[in-house]
Amino acid sequence: MILSDRTINQMIKNGELVVEPLEEYQIQPASIDLRLGSSFLKIDENLMEVMTLNDEIKYVNLERKEIIVPPNSFLLATTREYIKLPPDITAFVEGRSSIGRMGLFIQNAGWVDPGFEGQITLELYNANRLPIKLTAGRRICQLVLARMDKEAKTPYQGKYLYQKKAVGSRVYQDLENKQNKN
């Protein structure tokens, strides 16, 4: 069941759900608008000939209040907000419709698991032939929260727990890679 603004407000007030910093206008009827942070990562194409699922990917770290996303390019960003989900709440990130209509696709590659705590890393893709200028602090995506039928037996304890700033892929830390080394 997707949570309403009333439930979201009550959970924040009770301390069950943490979204900080948060302004009242960010809470929508069935979601929370999240803002763009000032931490960005782009893949360093000069240090790698090819990316694999087995090796750490090299990134260029960019800290700034404004960034230009070139045409047909990919960039990692972060939300300004730090979130903490309880063990019975999961979430997913959707790009704002107004921004999607500009050709900027925003996602986070799946669900935000119950028990997750940290800033959310966003994957941005500019599908245009024109660059798009983005400013930190602008509402960029929506966090949709859903209550699970039961509390998770094992809340999220993965490799992105407590992340701050944009965090690159840690696919090289996957279980499959560890098993192949043994």
UniProtKB/Swiss-Prot annotation:
Record-listed dCTP binding positions: R96, S97, S98, I99, G100, R101, D113, T121, L122, E123, Q142, Y156, Q163
UniProt site (Important for bifunctional activity): G110, W111
Entry-linked SUPFAM superfamilies: dUTPase-like (SSF51283)
Catalytic residues, chain numbering: E123 (proton donor/acceptor)
InterPro entries referenced in this protein's UniProt entry, alphabetically: dCTP_deaminase, dUTPase-like_sf, dUTPase_trimeric
Keywords of this entry: Hydrolase, Nucleotide metabolism, Nucleotide-binding
GO molecular function: dCTP deaminase (dUMP-forming) activity; dCTP deaminase activity; nucleotide binding
E.C. number: 3.5.4.30
Reaction equations catalysed: dCTP + 2 H2O = dUMP + NH4(+) + diphosphate
GO process terms (BP): dUMP biosynthetic process; dUTP biosynthetic process; nucleobase-containing small molecule interconversion
Pathway listed: Pyrimidine metabolism; dUMP biosynthesis; dUMP from dCTP: step 1/1
Chain's role: Bifunctional enzyme that catalyzes both the deamination of dCTP to dUTP and the hydrolysis of dUTP to dUMP without releasing the toxic dUTP intermediate.
Family: Belongs to the dCTP deaminase family.
Quaternary structure note: Homotrimer.
Record-given protein name: dCTP deaminase, dUMP-forming
Record organism: Halothermothrix orenii (strain H 168 / OCM 544 / DSM 9562)
Gene from which this protein is expressed: dcd
